[in-house]
Amino acid sequence: MSGASVKVAVRVRPFNSRETSKESKCIIQMQGNSTSIINPKNPKEAPKSFSFDYSYWSHTSPEDPCFASQSRVYNDIGKEMLLHAFEGYNVCIFAYGQTGAGKSYTMMGKQEESQAGIIPQLCEELFEKINDNCNEDMSYSVEVSYMEIYCERVRDLLNPKNKGNLRVREHPLLGPYVEDLSKLAVTSYTDIADLMDAGNKARTVAATNMNETSSRSHAVFTIVFTQKKQDPETNLSTEKVSKISLVDLAGSERADSTGAKGTRLKEGANINKSLTTLGKVISALAEVDNCTSKSKKKKKTDFIPYRDSVLTWLLRENLGGNSRTAMVAALSPADINYDETLSTLRYADRAKQIKCNAVINEDPNAKLVRELKEEVTRLKDLLRAQGLGDIIDIDPLMDDYSGSGGKYLKDFQNNKHRYLLASENQRPGNFSTASMGSLTSSPSSCSLNSQAGLTSVTSIQERIMSTPGGEEAIERLKESEKIIAELNETWEEKLRKTEAIRMEREALLAEMGVAIREDGGTLGVFSPKKTPHLVNLNEDPLMSECLLYYIKDGITRVGQADAERRQDIVLSGAHIKEEHCIFRSERNNTGEVIVTLEPCERSETYVNGKRVAHPVQLRSGNRIIMGKNHVFRFNHPEQARAEREKTPSAETPSEPVDWTFAQRELLEKQGIDMKQEMEKRLQEMEILYKREKEEADLLLEQQRLDYESKLQALQKQVETRSLAAETTEEEEEEEEVPWTQHEFELAQWAFRKWKSHQFTSLRDLLWGNAVYLKEANAISVELKKKVQFQFVLLTDTLYSPVPPELLPTEMGKTHEDRPFPRTVVAVEVQDLKNGATHYWSLDKLKQRLDLMREMYDRAGEVGSNAQDDSETTMTGSDPFYDRFHWFKLVGSSPIFHGCVNERLADRTPSPTFSTADSDITELADEQQDAMEDFDDEAFVDDTGSDAGTEEGSELFSDGHDPFYDRSPWFILVGRAFVYLSNLLYPVPLIHRVAIVSEKGEVRGFLRVAVQAIAADEEAPDYGSGIRQSGTAKISFDNEYFNQSDFPSAAMTRSGLSLEELRIVEGQGQSSEVISPPEEVNRMNDLDLKSGTLLDGKMVMEGFSEEIGNHLKLGSAFTFRVTVLQASGILPEYADIFCQFNFLHRHDEAFSTEPLKNNGRGSPLGFYHVQNIAVEVTESFVDYIKTKPIVFEVFGHYQQHPLHLQGQELNSPPQPSRRFFPPPMPLSRPVPATKLNTMNKTSLGQSMSKYDLLVWFEISELEPTGEYIPAVVDHTAGLPCQGTFLLHQGIQRRITVTIIHEKGSELHWKDVRELVVGRIRNKPEVDEAAVDAILSLNIISAKSLKSSHSSSRTFYRFEAVWDSSLHNSLLLNRVTPYGEKIYMTLSAYLELDHCIQPAVITKDVCMVFYSRDAKISPPRSLRNLFGSGYSKSPDSNRVTGIYELSLCKMADTGSPGMQRRRRKVLDTSVAYVRGEENLAGWRPRGDSLILEHQWELEKLELLHEVEKTRHFLLLRERLGDSIPKSMSDSLSPSLSSGTLSTSTSISSQISTTTFESAITPSESSGYDSADIESLVDREKELATKCLQLLTHTFNREFSQVHGSISDCKLSDISPIGRDPSVSSFSSSTLTPSSTCPSLVDSRSSSMDQKTPEANSRASSPCQEFEQFQIIPTVETPYLARAGKNEFLNLVPDIEEVRAGSVVSKKGYLHFKEPLSSNWAKHFVVVRRPYVFIYNSDKDPVERGIINLSTAQVEYSEDQQAMLKTPNTFAVCTKHRGVLLQALNDKDMNDWLYAFNPLLAGTIRSKLSRRCPSQPKY
C-alpha cells in the first residue's frame, strides 16, 4: 500500500511526589490536538505550540472531563494497530520521553485492571478476537518474545538459561534479528500475562532522583501473529504473518537532574546514546521524506544511521519501513523539567514527518522457505566450486537439526583456529554423525564414514581454512539451515518446546528454593522439608540464613569456579581450594539419609570448631567453617524431626547458633580463651597507661619548675628596671615645667574635641549590626510582611530630640556629664501596611529578631494556616509591627511625650494651667475638660480585647503585647523657635518663623507675636478666634535652671554648637585651619560677652546696669505670647494644632485648638493668646537673652504616604538616597601582573597634594598607516564621561596624558605597567567574576614640552592594545543596539622619592561598530538646535580628575593606636537565608554618617537663620536708639549669626578684613562700635590682611601680572594643592599672601557642604579615611627636608567625580598675563571645581580650578585702578587670574557661585550703604 505517516500522540502525566515537594508549576497546555509549552524562565515569551494526532490530558484526576484514561489511549491507538495486525501488516508502538515521564505506565500499566497499559489490553483483545472467530477454515497461532537492550547489549527476558548477551545478526532476507532469542508459543492471554510478568521481573530497573523505578533498559515485546486460511475449493492454505512490536524505551535523562553516578551514570550514557541515535534516525527519515518530492536524486546526507545503535538497528523496519508505527510521547508537566519536555516535543514533532511503506505479509513462510532454499543451493554451489562438495553434499531437509552434528558444528566453530578438536565426540568412529547441521544420512555421509580411518578432522579444517571464502560460506550455510529448521518446526513441536522451557524454569526455581503456584506465579522462598542443606551464617544478623545450598543425592562438590571439574557449590576466598571438600549423601539400610563430609587434601575445613582431615558424618545443627570466612550450619530436616520424636523433652539451647557462636566455638577448640585474652590485654594497657601518665606528670612538673624559675628571673629584671625608671621619672618630674592656664585650656579643648568624635564607633555599629538588619528584611519579604528596616542616625538636637528609649544605657548614665548631644544608631521601621514609621534601638531590633525567627519557624510548620493578610495580624504577636492604632505619631520626641502624653493620659491638672496664684478662665476649664475627654479617644488600645486570641500572645504572661507600642493620634509636623531678646528693651515683635521637620525640611511658617504687657492688660480681640485672658506663672529658679537637662547657654551659640555637634572626625568647619589656641580664645570671648561660662553658671557682672528697670531682680514681669497664624502646611495633614513650651519646662506646654487644614489657601488662624507671669531672676534674664521658646505643630495624615509604598506586597526595600545623588560606580585598581602584590600601606602625614587632569584616548589604525584617536560620544553632558566609538577588529593604542602643576616633590620616572581587565556590559563591577587581566606593551613614555612657556607638567605614555587577547565575546563582536561595554584600566607609575608606584584607575565605556561603518559623534538636542557640534580632533578624549597625595608612611604607633586601627568586620556582606529575595538591597554604610552630618548642618543653618532674622528684626525695630550696652548684650547673637553659620572664625576674620580693605577709611560699612568690639587677635589679623591688600592693589595689579607672566590662560588647569598655607614675601601677590585663611577654611567648608564633592571612590574600609584631618605644613616637604636627604613617600591617588549640580555656567573673560587682551572661555562651576572649556560646544575639560584651595578676591578700588568694571580675581597657590563678567548682575552671580559667603557679604555691605526706614 502507499506510504502512511507515523501516528504521534503526546500524553502529560500528573505531578509526582518529587515535583509536588518542589512546588512545581504546570507548563503544558492542551487544546484539542494542539499542545503548548510555556517557558518558565521567560514567562513573557510566547508559548511554543505543536500539533499532533492525539493530545492526551492526564494531568488532573479522572473526574476531569478532559482526563485521558488508559482505555482512551488504547482505543485511539491500540485498537487501530491491532486491526492493522489482523489485516496482515507489521505493527509497532513505542513510547518515548524523559525518565519518569510515564512511558512504562502507558505501555505496561499497573496490576489493576482499570490501569492496564497498551500492551496488556492489546494482547487481551487479540485473543478475544481469536476466540470470537467462527470460521472453521481460519486458524491462528501466536508466538511471543521479550528482550531488553541494556547498555547496548541484548538479553532474553523469557529464557532463564540465556543468561548471556545475545548477538544481533542481519540476514539478507529477514534483516536484523536476535540470534537464539526465545520465541514461545502461547494459546491464551494468561500465558502472555505470565510471560510478561516474568520478563518484567527480570528487567533492569534502578532508582534515580527523578524516578524511583526508572527503566534502565529498552524493552521490546514482540508478538508474531500468524493467520492460516484453508481454501476448500483449491485445497490450498494461505498464511498472513504480522509482527507486532511493542517497545518501552528507557527515559532520556541528564546526569545533573537524575543525580546519576557510577553504574547509573554509565547506564544513562548508553541510554542517551541510543536515544540520540533514534533522534538522528527520525530526523534523517523526516528529511528524506521532505526531500523526496523536491529531488529524487539521493544525496550523501540521505544516509540513515541505523547501525549506530542496537535499538535503531532492530527497529529499522518499524521506522520508515514495512510497518504501521505509532509513537506515544510522555511528557512531564513540571517547570523544573522544561528542557527535557521541550526536547521530547521536538522529537515527536519530527517523527510526524516519517512515512512508512507497509505491505500485507501474504504467506510469508512459503515465500521465505523458497528464498532460503535458493540461498542454500547457491551456497552449496559456491562450496562445490571451491572443491568442498564432498563435505556439504547432504540434503539439509532430511533430518532434524538437533543431532550430534549440531554439537560438531558448534565445536567446529569454537575451535576453528585449532588443528585438533578436544571433544569426546570427535573420535574417528563418531565422525560419521558430525555432518553439517546434522542433516539426514546420504551416500555422501556413507562415503565419509568409510573414509573415517583415512581422513581426519585436521585435514577437513585445513581444507576449509585454506579455501578463500570457505569459512564465511560455511557460517552462512549454517544460519540458513538453522532458520529453515525453525520454520519447518510444527506448531505442536513449538508448544512442546515452550512447555519444556517452562518446566526447566520451574525446576530451576524449585532447585533454588523458590515455590511456584499452580498458575505459574511466584509464591515465595521456603526451607526444604526433606532435603539436607546448608545455610550461611554471617556476622551481620540480617545477612544470616540468606543463602541456601542443597546437598543432592550422591556427591555434592564444593570448590572454586575455575576448578577442572564442575563444582556444585562455588565458593571464593584465599583459603578455598579448587576442590575443597565433598558432601556424600547416601541411604543406609534403614532408609535414613546419611551425609558425610570428606575434606580434600590440605583444605581447611572445621566441624563444630574442630579441623577435620578425615570423613565426618554430619548431624543436623553442626557448624561448618570452610576456609576462614565461610560459615554454615548443616540442616537435616528428617534427622532433626526424628531426634525430636525420640527426645521430646530436649531443651532448646540457651544460646542461638549463629556466627558468633561458631567463631567462639572455633577459638575454644583451638585453645584460645577470649575472655582471658581480653583480660590479659586490658591489664597490659592499664600498666602502659599508668607508666605513660607518670612520665607525663613528671615532665609537666619539670616544665612548671622551669617556667617558675624563668618568671622569677624576669620579675627581678622588671623590678630592677622599674626602680630605675621611677628614679628617672622623679628626676624628670623635678625638671618639668608646670603647665600654664593656657596649656590646660588647650589640653581640655583637645580632649573634649576627641571625646566628641563618633565616626569610628558609629561605623562599627553600622557594620556590626548590618547582618541583623538584612536578616530582618529577608524574613519580612519571605513572610510577605510589608515592613522595611533600614539604619538611621538620630542626634538629640532642638529640632530632633531623641526619645530616651533609643538611647543606650551607658549613654543615659553619662548624659548629664556630656556638654553636647550624642548621636545614636537606630533602626527606621517603615510599616507600609499601616502607614506608620517607628524607630527601634539596636537592642530592640535584636529582641524582635528572635521573635521573627520564631515566627518564621512557625510559619514553616503551619504554612497552610498562615493568615498574613487577616485582621488578626495587625494586633497579634507579630514582631514586624509596632502596636499601631488608627492615629499615629511619627518621630516622637521627649517634649511631645512629656506634654501630650501626660496631658492626655494623665488626668491630674497640669501646673501650667492651675497654680496657686493663677486664675483659670472658662476657656482654660473648657480646654482642660476637652483634653480629659480626649484622653479616652486619643489612644486606641486593643491589647486587652483580642490579643489573647492571636498567635503567640500566650507567650507573654504579663498581658502586654510586646510587638506593639502606643501611638497617639497626631504626628509632629515640625518645630519652630522664637527668641525673646525683644523683652529686654522691651519692644513688641511679630515673628514669622519656619516650621522645620526633624529631617531639615521646611513644612510651613508660623506667625507669633511676643510683647511685654502690664499685669492687668487685656488681650486683643481677634474676632472669632480664641481669646485667652488667663495668666500662667512660670518659675525660673537659678539652681533648678542650672541643673536641668536642656541645652546650656554655651551650646545654644552656634559658634560652639556648630563645632561640637560634629559627629564625623575632622568635619569641623575650622578643623584644618583654626589652631586650638584660637578656638579657646574664641570660646572665652564669647563667654565673656554673654556673661556665661562653659559649665553654664552665670557671671552677671554689672547686671543691674545692663538691663532696664522693667527687669529688676525679684520683680514681677508679664509678657504675652500670641500664636497668630500658620501657613504653607501641606494639605495631607488634616487637623492642625500648635503648642509651645520653655526649654527647661518641656513638661508644661500651652496648646491651641485643632483647626481644619484646607490646603495652601488662606492661612490657619489660631489667634491663641497666652499671658505668662514670671519672677525676674538671673536665670530668666539669661533665658530671654540666649534661649528660645519651642513651638511644635502637630497634625494627622488623611492618608499616610507610606500607604502608597505598601501597595506592592513583595517589593524589597530600596536603599535610601535622601540627600546624596546616586554616585557613579568606581572600580578598584586592576591587579598588576608584573609587579609584586602591593598591600595598602597605612598612610601617615600628608606632605603635599596635587590635582591631576588626565586625558584618555584610544587610537585606531587608519588605512593611511597612522593611528587616529577614535570618536568619543559626549552626549551625556557630564564632565569626565564619554563613550569611545570603536571599529571591530582594528589594531588600537591607548594613550594617557597626565597634566598637573609643577612641584618639587612630583617627578614621573617611568610607567611600570598598564593593565586592562574587568570586561563587562554594565557599569557595576561583579567582584565574583573571573576575568582575564591583560598587561599592555608600553611603547613610549615621556614628558612633553608645551608650545609656550608653561608651568604645567605634561606626561604622556602610549601602549599597544590587542583586544582579541582578552578572548571576550563583548570585545570581539559588534555591540548590540542599546548596550555598552565597560572596561577598567589601571596604570602603575613610578615617582621619585616614592617607595611604591602610584595607580591611576579609570572605567572606560566603549561601543563597537562594524569594521567599515562610518562613525560620527551623536548630536544632543541642545546641539541639534544650536550651531552644531564641536568636531575638533582634540575632542576625542575622555577626561579624569584625580587627587594625588604624597604621604609619609604611618608609624605603627602605640598598642592603643593599633587597637584603634582595628579591622571591623563588615557584616553586610555575610549571607543570610532569603537574601536573594531582597533584589540587591543592602544596609546603609558609612555614607549614612555623611548624610546625617549634612542633615545636622542643615538644621543648624536653619536655626541660625531664625536667630539672625530675629536679631535683624529687633535691630530694625530699635533703629538708632539702641544703646551701646544693649548692643553689647546682643553681640552674642551677632557673633553666632549668619557669619558663623557656614564658615569658621577665620571666615569672619577674612570677611571683616575684606570689608576693611575695600574702604579703609572711616566710611566702612561698620560703625565705630563694631570696630571696637573686635578682640585684639581679630584686630591684629585684620590689620595684617589690610596692609597686604592695600599694598598689593596700590601696585595697580602689577604683581598679579608678574606672578602669572610665565603662563597663558590656556594653561589654567589642575591646580597643585598643598594642605598648608605657604608663607611668601609681602611684596608679591600670591594666593597664600592674599588669602591665608580662606584656603583651608571657607573653601574647604563649602566643599564639605556640598555632597557631590564627597563622591569619591573608596572601599567600605576607606570611606572615612579620606576625611581625616590633614595637619598643616608651612613649607614644601622636599624643600624642608633638603634635596640630598633620602625620602620615602607613599603616593595615594583617588579619582574625584564632579558633582551633578551646576552652580553657574556661562562665558567669562580671562586676563592674559603681560597682555592687554582678554580671552573668552566657557566656564562651568560644579563645586568644588571650576571647569574651563574653549566654548560651550567643547566637550573636553581644558582646565580646572579647585575652589577648596583658591581664594576669590573682589575690590572696587581694584576695578577703579584697572578701569575694568565687573572684575574679580581668583588666586591659587601657583598663579593669580583676573576674570571679567558681562555686567554687574552677572558678576554677582559668578561671585555667588565661586564663594557664596563673599557674595553675601558684598550684598550686605551694599544694603547697609542705603539703610531703609525701620518697619514696625
From Swiss-Prot:
One of its GO terms (cellular component) is dendrite. Residues 470-512, 672-731 form a coiled coil. Gene3D superfamilies: 2.60.200.20, 6.10.250.2520, Kinesin motor domain, Pleckstrin-homology domain (PH domain)/Phosphotyrosine-binding domain (PTB). It catalyses: ATP + H2O + a kinesin associated with a microtubule at position (n) = ADP + phosphate a kinesin associated with a microtubule at position (n+1, toward the plus end). Its main location: cytoplasm. GO terms for biological process: anterograde neuronal dense core vesicle transport; anterograde synaptic vesicle transport; cellular response to nerve growth factor stimulus; lysosome localization; mitochondrion transport along microtubule; neuromuscular synaptic transmission; neuron-neuron synaptic transmission; organelle transport along microtubule. The modification Phosphothreonine is found at T647, T652. The modification Phosphoserine is found at S1054, S1057, S1416, S1454, S1487, S1573, S1603, S1610, S1613. Its EC number is 5.6.1.3. Residues 1701-1799 form the PH domain. Belongs to the TRAFAC class myosin-kinesin ATPase superfamily. Kinesin family. Unc-104 subfamily. This is Kinesin-like protein KIF1B. It comes from Rattus norvegicus (Rat). The lineage of its organism: Eukaryota, Metazoa, Chordata, Craniata, Vertebrata. The gene is Kif1b.
